[in-house]
Amino acid sequence: MAHDVRADFPRSQELLICRLHRGPFSSAIMRLRLPLLACVVLVFSLGLRLPAAETHAATRAAFLKLLDRPRVPLAAEVGTTSELKEELVEIAFSYAAEAGQRVPGIIVKPTSSSASSPSSAYVRRPVVIVLHGTGGNKEGERALLIDYARAGFVGVAIDGRYHGARAKGGKAAKASEYVDAILQTFRTGQEYPFFFDTAWDVMRLIDYLETRDDVDPRRIGAIGFSKGGIELYLAAAADPRIAVAVPCIGVQSFRWATDHDSWQSRIGTVQAAFNAAAQDSGVTNPGADFVRTFYARVAPGIDAAFDGPAMLPLIAPRPLLAINGEIDARTPMPGLKLCAEAARSAYHTAGADNKFVLRVQPNTGHKVNPDSMVAAREWLVRWLQP
């Protein structure tokens, strides 16, 4: 049976609280009786020096606690199967991520038999999960799924929250319902469609994939683009079942961007929600201070305890290839360097220097070049061995 990372909540919380209680801020913390997330934010804000392993365990536990919600049966359903060219097949499926949230997906894979075991009913293959960006959908990743299936993988894509079939307006809605949902989160504090909920959906997707007899659960990798890249590194930091991760044009430091007046491009992806939230709050000409308020409501900790430099080290020692554009305003280079420094330190400590690579595309903005797509595929093939 796979290890349930959510079971680590109590032990990790105990480790962090005990360490803080023995430190110079112990009396204040004991009086405040801070919950786990607040303790992790306090550590981050005050720059308290804890052993890396304890900090990482506490950060993961706090993030999992933030994501956690009542468990429901997967209630997985397999829909239509379509034969594709080159002995590939496409399978529609869905599963329950939580109450009221069914996640539709598609699988593209080679036909079950193989030259090495032609009589086998099923061949367990490695998986590549593909996560789309803002305004995208699972069907938009079909060509990439086919490419990975040709290489011997089971390619899987799902619709993110309020995207594709999960938007009332369907594909035509693009990102409008997603942006409106983020505004509703700001107003009500319910749901976290800005990255966090889809990270949870990915973890539940892995729960589903583990039930399939054509999947090798020890070899599950993922690639994500922009919003999907952020969701991927968050999910990989939280869930060690993601064996290999390739976040593309997503790795960043939200905090650095906010502190250095470089937040506009990232906020621009949800501009309508941000503007309406500022209007609700009576804020004209919103700046960095309101950006922090906005993030705290729609994705608590994304610019603090769960920022890129805090989350990437949690992926070590699993193979991690981050692909970014040198002049991408959504992932400013100085903040990206902070993420890379934190990751390199963690991978070095783990004795896995060769398992972290930052690929910076020269003179490139918010896109992934063809040569980087080749590099991503080679990375997944290298470590997942289809």
What are these regions (language model features)?
Residues 244-311, 332, 336-341, 346-353:
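Mobile cap/lid helix-loop segments that gate and shape the active-site cleft of serine hydrolases
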Residues 322-324:
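Short beta-strand/loop motif that positions the catalytic acidic residue
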Residues 277, 286, 340-386:
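C-terminal catalytic histidine-bearing segment of alpha/beta-hydrolase fold enzymes
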Residues 203-269, 300-303:
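Primarily recognizes the serine-hydrolase "nucleophile elbow" in alpha/beta-hydrolase
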Residues 69-113:
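N-terminal cap/lid segment of alpha/beta-hydrolase-fold proteins
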Residues 35-49:
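Bacterial N-terminal signal peptides
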Residues 327-331, 365-367:
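Acidic catalytic loop of the alpha/beta-hydrolase fold
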Residues 123-124, 129, 133-200, 254-261:
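Cap/lid segment of the alpha/beta-hydrolase catalytic domain
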